[in-house]
Amino acid sequence: MKRFDLIIRSSTVVTETTTYRADVAIRNGIVSAITEPGSISSDDGPAIDGTGLHLFPGMVDVHVHFNEPGRTEWEGFASGSKSLAAGGVTTYFDMPLNSNPPTITREELDKKRQLANEKSLVDYRFWGGLVPGNIDHLQDLHDGGVIGFKAFMSECGTDDFQFSHDETLLKGMKKIAALGSILAVHAESNEMVNALTTIAIEEQRLTVKDYSEARPIVSELEAVERILRFAQLTCCPIHICHVSSRKVLKRIKQAKGEGVNVSVETCPHYLLFSLDEFAEIGYLAKCAPPLRERQEVEDLWDGLMAGEIDLISSDHSPSLPQMKTGKTIFEVWGGIAGCQNTLAVMLTEGYHKRKMPLTQIVQLLSTEPAKRFGLYPQKGTIQVGAEASFTLIDLNESYTLNASDLYYRHPISPYVGQRFRGKVKHTICQGKHVYQDH
């Protein structure tokens, strides 16, 4: 009988604190041994040669929309999780909206879990929704195991997940705090965005720059300021999604100093693309909050390098191809398909271009998401006793992303055509070999 189910030989292990060469052995989905390279016998189990490769903990993507049930023509657990595996992600948190019906009751949560259990290639958790009228369902959703709750402070683009006015937010946050849970927030001012959008359309200002100006940074700041005050009032932990500007980070940093229990994420598209690229790529790069000026991108990197951002998520938000076409930027679907490319962006733009330490990339993509949501040290690190979920990476392999490389149901993405350096070669999830580069 073999001692181990799988051995990763002679790779450079990267954790949140250090790097070192080792053999890593897996048994029953758990890291069973970490030893000097070459010290485990070839008779002890099947092996992957990690020579020249780096072994990262599996990424934890806390923000994806896989649209199942009800909108599997947009994505789905099978294609979405395969894309994640190809990008080095071994755990994802699926958002409650863009499936139909949304995950705002225990019944819908149970249906979604059954589908994911049947189809998902990697591990998962689910967000429950906070919407007007469902506060009485929060307890049942929590008992059903949601990782937290999600609310929108502005309209989300579909009619089946309503945004939350102040009363819903305050009542919901009080309940969520009592449950010991957390609220994730899409923070843009609904009234400001609607007013500026109406004015832009009336004046026939319909370029991508006009779209960005209709959702200005100040709309994020106004909403973030409000939700931080509500967090103080209710003692509710909050997680602010997809921040696009360092101006917002500075206010969140101040709130942390005041004792507010708040974390913040940004997304790879805000770290790679600016308004200039938005104009070149077109509607595929529409998202909310929108892409910003190049200086805002660089400032966001400064904040990231300085530790002002807790974690990186993809906010993978796919749609039918025809939803990305239309007469004006204001009419098309706002969402970017990108969950397969988060690590590639961070290695290319972070490690290679800006000399971000690999340990910091692990913190942002694996460790801090796991810690914030109570999954560490089972996930988010590589150590004996931890879950055997990791990805083997060739840091120096360069490639141009082609649509044929993507595993999404619809291989359309603003990342297509981008040049990346650093490629996932293998992904292991709970001891199972779920992806191998060809």
From Swiss-Prot:
InterPro entries: Allantoinase, Allantoinase_bact, Amidohydro-rel, DHOase/Allantoinase_Hydrolase, Dihydroorotase_CS, Metal-dep_hydrolase_composite, Metal_Hydrolase
Keyword Repressor tagged: no
Keywords of this entry: Hydrolase, Metal-binding, Purine metabolism, Zinc
Record: residues binding Zn(2+) 1: H63, H65, K150, D315
This enzyme's EC code(s): 3.5.2.5
Gene Ontology cellular-component terms listed: cytoplasm
Gene3D superfamilies: Metal-dependent hydrolases (3.20.20.140), Urease, subunit C, domain 1 (2.30.40.10)
Changes after translation: Carboxylation allows a single lysine to coordinate two zinc ions.
GO molecular function per UniProt: allantoinase activity; cobalt ion binding; zinc ion binding
Disulfide bridge map: none
Cofactor note: Binds 2 Zn(2+) ions per subunit.
Cofactor or coenzyme needed: Zn(2+)
Function per UniProt: Catalyzes the conversion of allantoin (5-ureidohydantoin) to allantoic acid by hydrolytic cleavage of the five-member hydantoin ring.
Protein name (database record): Allantoinase
Organism listed in the record: Halalkalibacterium halodurans (strain ATCC BAA-125 / DSM 18197 / FERM 7344 / JCM 9153 / C-125)
